Structure formats: structure tokens, C-alpha cells
UniProtKB/Swiss-Prot annotation:
Its main location: cytoplasm. It holds the Pfam family Thiolase_C. The lineage of its organism: Bacteria, Pseudomonadati, Pseudomonadota, Gammaproteobacteria, Enterobacterales. It comes from Shigella dysenteriae serotype 1 (strain Sd197). This is 3-ketoacyl-CoA thiolase. It is found in: Cytoplasm. PANTHER family: ACETYL-COA ACETYLTRANSFERASE, CYTOSOLIC, ACETYL-COA C-ACYLTRANSFERASE. InterPro entries: Ac-CoA_C-AcTrfase_FadI, Thiolase, Thiolase-like, Thiolase_acyl_enz_int_AS, Thiolase_AS, Thiolase_C, Thiolase_CS, Thiolase_N. One of its GO terms (biological process) is fatty acid beta-oxidation. It comes from the Bacteria.
Length: 436
């Protein structure tokens, strides 16, 4: 085993995760239609502080993320500070690591805690797939800039005359990778074919995710970590995630047509995570600061790792790459884990990563390691369901998974939990959590 990297301050304090909260997650263009990510972020951070009863001035830093950027609020973190009654002097900045954004936010706050520059901070993320930055064509954008600099009406009219009707059409946000032009679903199809993952296996995982998420809600396991969202103009509320299909059957999944490779594909809307709106956040402190304030943490951040691979083929293998590093830095093995929670971007991606974590060939030939990371025990894996069921507001998913895993670890009497995700650009993230 490689070098263990303890996540402690210079005084030996562990990094405590005090509490976490999220909004319910809503499918695109449903309950949160028209509510921008910055407002979802304010909603969850305001409620998190109110529930924790921690004075706002205790929080010295807020690191927040947003993947679908809105030009009018480029620093979502600072807008949340200013919009929630937090101390105006609270440091705040924004991060983006695609689907691992709130993992990055947590890591950044943890690094500030270890450096000794703060003793308490908030990390999280929010995204809206319903409020999108609809742009204009490159030609229209260029003409508008030139028109702004034109001095006479004739110059302006001449510039506008260059435009055609197609140049006036709105341009939605890109759904493909900038570098390759591939959509995430195209990559999921690649992975299904590369690793021999069948449609039946994908549908079974998706069905499992929905069944377990529905059961988690019915048993009341998520009530403490999901707020009730009152939706402007405050005539409606949302108390639970609205994507979960607890009454579906495997036969229902089989009816859907492939969404990306129409002829030969196996990836469908049902075995993929949907576009979703929502926000999530966690409070982190040094262990000594929690004792000063009389707080009992949910748990502790034991280690983390971020990785990057090539984007042209099977790029959603982040968990298979980042997990062995995070375990190594924590001084643990897969056998030591009580729970494993992997972001389910697609069932195909999830199953491919599970396969490679247990592969000796992948470990030796690709990672340069002597042994496989370890088989994933189904009884420990995504026990409360995953992103296919809950939904995936890109920047919020990491904070959801962290909070959910720590609560479940505490229900089980403590232990270690692995949380991990793939992300666009061939990125990967993994963290090891500890609860007592």
C-alpha cells in the first residue's frame, strides 16, 4: 500500500462534517421550473444554517459550485452569502468540476481548514436544468458587438444586413463534450459495448435504484437531510424528490427505446439519470471547533482523490481510477468499507466501474497496480438508491451523496464509507468518510 495521507490540521484536528442538507430534487421543468440555481443555493444554505443553529458569523468561508453557468451570477457562492444574511465579510468563491463539483467544494474547504486559514466553512452546489443560459449564434454575437461600436445608423444597418434568419435562432447550451463532440450518452454506449454490459443489466440496476430510493423515503430515512422547499410565489411546496418511480416494474423499463444509439444502443432514458434541478450543502469544521461549539459531527473526511483520463473512449471511468487512490490515502481497502455510494450517471457507466474495480487485468495493465482495488459487495453498494432515481443536479450530487452516506453510517453504528463519481472531461472523484 502507498503513502497514507492523514487529513488533519497542524494541531492534529480531523476535518469534521457537521451537518448536511439538500432541497428535494425535481425533474427538469417541473416543481422548480423558473427558479435559478442561485436561488436554490440560497434556499438550502439559509435552511442549513437555520437548522444547525450555528451563528452565521461562525462560518468563515463558503465554496459553492454551479455547472450550468448563468452569466448574470458568475460567482454563485458570493451571491449566496449576500442573499442569506450571512456575515458580509464571509469569504466566498465558486468552483466547477462538472458532476464532481461539490466534491471539489468540500475538498477546497477541507484544505482551508487544514491550512489553518479558517475553522468553519460551507461547501456545496446547485444547478437548474430548467433555467438555462440560452445564447445567440456566433455570427449574431459578432454583429451585435460591431453594432455597438458603429458610429452611424447606416453602418449599423449594413452590419445587420449580413444576418440571415438562421443567425437569429436561439442557441441552447451544449450537451456534448467541447473537445470531442460526444454526448455523455454516447460515452455510456461506448462503455456498454466495451465491457459487455447488456440492456437487461442496465435496466435491472435502474430498477434497483428506484426501488431502494422509494423504500428509503417510505421508511423516513431521508427526512432529516431533505428540506421542504416552498416555491415562489409560495403557493406550492415540494417535500420529496419527484423523479422516483417506486411502482415501476422491469417490464416497464424494457419498453423504452434507446436514446442515443437508436439502432443498436442499450442506453435509455430510464437507465440514465434525468436532467434535474436542486441544491445541496454541508458544513465543515475542525474537530476542535466542533467541541468548542458543543456540536456532534455527522462524521469526518478521511481522504479524497481526483483523477483525469482521456476523453475519447470510455471517459466515465472516474470511480475506477480515483477509488484506489482515495483508499490508499486513507490506509484502507475495499474490505474495510461499510458502505459504497457511486454516482449513477448511467447504469452502463456504473456497471463498468464496478467491473473494473474488481479487475486484476485493469489494475495491472492500466493502473500499474499489483492487485485489483476489490470486488464491490452488493450489500454495501448504493443501499439507499442512487442518482438514476433521485436525479442529478450536476453541482449538488456530491454533497447529497456525502450527507446521505454519513447518515446511513450512523444508523449502522459507524464505519467507513466510500463516495465516488465520474465527471465530464474524463474526471473522477472519490472520498472516504468516517462515522463513529
Amino acid at each position: 500500500m502507498g503513502q497514507v495521507l492523514p487529513l488533519v490540521t497542524r494541531q492534529g484536528d480531523r476535518i469534521a462534517i457537521v451537518s448536511g442538507l439538500r432541497t428535494p430534487f425535481a425533474r427538469q421543468a417541473t416543481a422548480f421550473h423558473g427558479i435559478p440555481a442561485v436561488d436554490l443555493g440560497k434556499m438550502v444554505v439559509g435552511e442549513l444554517l437555520a437548522r444547525s443553529e450555528i451563528p452565521a458569523e461562525v462560518i468563515e468561508q463558503l465554496v459553492f459550485g454551479q455547472v450550468v453557468q448563468m452569466p448574470e451570477a458568475p460567482n454563485i457562492a458570493r451571491e449566496i452569502v449576500l442573499g442569506t444574511g450571512m456575515n458580509v465579510h464571509t469569504d466566498a468563491y465558486s468552483v466547477s468540476r462538472a458532476c464532481a463539483t461539490s466534491f471539489q467544494a468540500v475538498a477546497n474547504v477541507a484544505e482551508s481548514l487544514m491550512a489553518g486559514t479558517i475553522r468553519a466553512g460551507i461547501a456545496g452546489g446547485a444547478d437548474s436544468s430548467s433555467v438555462l443560459p440560452i445564447g445567440v449564434s456566433k455570427k449574431l454575437a459578432r454583429v451585435l458587438v460591431d453594432v455597438n461600436k458603429a458610429r452611424t445608423m447606416s453602418q449599423r444597418l449594413k452590419l445587420f444586413s449580413r444576418l440571415r434568419l438562421r443567425d437569429l435562432m436561439p442557441v441552447p447550451p451544449a450537451v456534448a463534450e467541447y473537445s470531442t463532440g460526444l454526448r455523455m450518452g454516447d460515452t455510456a454506449e461506448q462503455m456498454a459495448k466495451t465491457y459487455g454490459i447488456t440492456r437487461e443489466q442496465q435496466d435491472a440496476l435502474a430498477h434497483r435504484s428506484h426501488q431502494r430510493a422509494a423504500q428509503s423515503w417510505s421508511e423516513g430515512k431521508l427526512k432529516e437531510e431533505v428540506m421542504t422547499a416552498f416555491i415562489p410565489p409560495y403557493k406550492q411546496l415540494l417535500a420529496e424528490d419527484n423523479n422516483i418511480c417506486g411502482n415501476s416494474s422491469l417490464a416497464d423499463y424494457a419498453k423504452l427505446r434507446p436514446a442515443f444509439d437508436r439502432k443498436h444502443g442499450t442506453v435509455t432514458a430510464a437507465n440514465s439519470t434525468p436532467l434535474t434541478d436542486g441544491a445541496a450543502a454541508v458544513i465543515l469544521m475542525t474537530e476542535s471547533r466542533t467541541k468548542e461549539l458543543g456540536l456532534v459531527p455527522l462524521g469526518y473526511l478521511r481522504s479524497y482523490a481526483f483523477t483525469a483520463i482521456d476523453v475519447w473512449q470510455d471517459m466515465l471511468l472516474g470511480p475506477a481510477w480515483s477509488t484506489p487512490l482515495a483508499l490508499e490515502r486513507a490506509g484502507l481497502t475495499m474490505a474495510d468499507l461499510t458502505l459504497i455510494d457511486m454516482h449513477e450517471a448511467f447504469a452502463a457507466q456504473t456497471l463498468a466501474n464496478i467491473q473494473l474495480l474488481g479487475s486484476e487485468r485493469f489494475a495491472c495493465n492500466v493502473l500499474g497496480r499489483a492487485h485489483a482495488t476489490g470486488e464491490v459487495d452488493d450489500s454495501k453498494f448504493n443501499v439507499l438508491g442512487g442518482s438514476i432515481a433521485y436525479g442529478h443536479p450536476f453541482a449538488a450530487t456530491g454533497a447529497r451523496i456525502i450527507t446521505q452516506t454519513l447518515h446511513e453510517l450512523r444508523r449502522r453504528g459507524g464505519g467507513f464509507g466510500l463516495v465516488t463519481a465520474c465527471a465530464a472531461g474524463g474526471l473522477g472523484a472519490a472520498m472516504v468518510l468516517e462515522a463513529e
